[in-house]
């Protein structure tokens, strides 16, 4: 019996020991009021609204020269790939036998018109002499009367010949313009990017440019804006450019152009469909140009708005379903407070409603923090 009571006593002691350890492990450690957290309040910071748009590196200004069959036969390509050209540099020349014949015919017609006018002028002079002889015989008035109809006829012929000469001169000017067009010149200053001999000899089924000119030192990034974003993006806004290909680098730029009307090709493709229209966007790069070539893809982060706002570090704001919230510290306990947010950047989140400047917000809430939990700041 005595052994039984000793066993019961040992069991009770063990149970008490285990219970005390469980209590100690569940209770806060000595000298601590709960989980230690870092707190702070909302602060006024400058925050920017941004629009992210994919874009492509392109020449700011470029020229494509296509084969034009109506000009005649392509005689000569005067540049090669890599050549530097200035505005007005001859690129290609055409020959046109029909145009040469028309030009020669025009010259002959002009000579004929001039000869006709000279002949009529000689007849008028002869008529004046005839009139003076008649005056001696029948008097001045009678002489004028007899000569009048013949003079009127000659003057009419002369006027008609002069009109025909003017028409011939106009044709000559038109032909001169067409002859001038047989030499295609550069419209920009830049570098010959490519020369396509097959396009020049018409061997390609798809029309391709014979010559492509661009300026590698004058590049832009172009993209497309949605209807919604085009209301926010304006000319002159700052842009930060990044590339997945050229990692670890950023470039600065400004919006240089926003289309007033949708992209024509996009609009044509979207006719009769539910596709949203898109507006062309162009960004001018500042400073050093990217090492990439035209065609490289970039991401444009456009700063559309910059203002002062009440903010918290983004990691302090949590989300459950569609509701954003933070934890504040009140009377040593964490308290969940629902908030309404505005703009969000990588580091800051705008707080529009739900907090005051006096509220102490947990800046580093872990997943273990819960509403009503004892914390120490």
Swiss-Prot record:
Q: Does the keyword Coiled coil apply?
A: yes
Keywords tagged on the record: Cell membrane, Coiled coil, Membrane, Transmembrane, Transmembrane helix
Q: Tell me, how does this one assemble?
A: Part of a complex composed of YknX, YknY and YknZ. The complex interacts with YknW.
Which NCBIfam families is this protein grouped with? RND_mfp
What is one term from the GO cellular component aspect held by the record? plasma membrane
**Matching PANTHER family, A to Z?**
EFFLUX SYSTEM COMPONENT YKNX-RELATED
Q: Give the protein family.
A: Belongs to the membrane fusion protein (MFP) (TC 8.A.1) family.
**Membrane-protein topology:** Single-pass membrane protein
Q: Coiled coil located at which positions?
A: 95-187
This entry's comment on induction and repression of expression is:
Expressed in exponential-phase cells.
Transmembrane annotation, as ranges: 3-23
Q: Name the species this protein comes from.
A: Bacillus subtilis (strain 168)
**GO MF annotation list:** identical protein binding; transmembrane transporter activity
Q: What is this protein called?
A: Putative efflux system component YknX
